[in-house]
């Protein structure tokens, strides 16, 4: 997450911006540390609010977030200090006194940006909400109280300072409330598109970056989060790499349709180029200064349009997790 994206290779916001799109990103950047060659302001993002620091991104009451607004005239990404947090220690009993909850702040900025979009100019938004990863923490509000009553006998977790996660009571209630909070965020995004009259011309995708984890006291077994799939985050079993992918495009994508097409996130660049009408994007965006440069992705636009016969497929799919020397290859009817 701290390692910068390679500046020699184009990323999706840069392509969208070059083709007339207003670009916004709200949440976790994970594409380079502060001051690196790959921060949102340098990679095609017009407006950003959220985490650039990977360390802070594991906490919901961080010391600071980052923001950038090209229209406002910002010259670079800057820090936004969480004044209601910094007077209290990051680990220990004082942490519970922090008040600036990052998830709500990020969502508020995302909605504000979305409400400023219109039919007159295309827009590309990436809302990388971090809920429910990885710290189990949120305001002690009615939502959390509801789940505390639901789980009468709940699990506690003692905390782990080296991993920066504080002790947690009611871990199941915390997790369930965080999922419900995320669900409410998604509902507000969809409702905003409907109210703005943008739903029929906006593709919305809801997905995740990996399977469930056990960090911070999370208990995926209790919630049966991956059903019958084996494995967790940081593993190459299906439980670690097979994730939800839900798409809505009113009037274009048929409702209540499922697909068993295997694909990967690198297929989204050509897919978004198809959606945006960007033609010949490999030739246009390959770095001609590099001896070897290419795009791995295959557009899944035909599948989104329920045109399975036109859908090209990968001869194989490959995953690896270097920290544990895991490799997986999938070919054919597996």
PLM ranges: what are they?
Residues 1-25, 34-35, 40-47, 57, ...:
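Active-site segment of extracytoplasmic enzymes that catalyze sulfate/phosphate-ester chemistry
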Residues 2-5, 233-238, 318-320, 326, ...:
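Short Gly/Pro-enriched turn/cap motifs at secondary-structure boundaries
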Residues 13, 113, 325-331:
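Short, surface-exposed beta-strand/loop micro-motifs that present aromatic residues
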Residues 18-24, 43-46, 119-125, 198-204, ...:
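Loop/turn elements at helix/coil->beta-strand transitions in domains of secreted/extracellular proteins
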Residues 31, 35, 54-269, 273-294, ...:
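Active-site-proximal cap/lid insertion segments
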Residues 48-49, 246:
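Short, well-ordered beta-strand core segments
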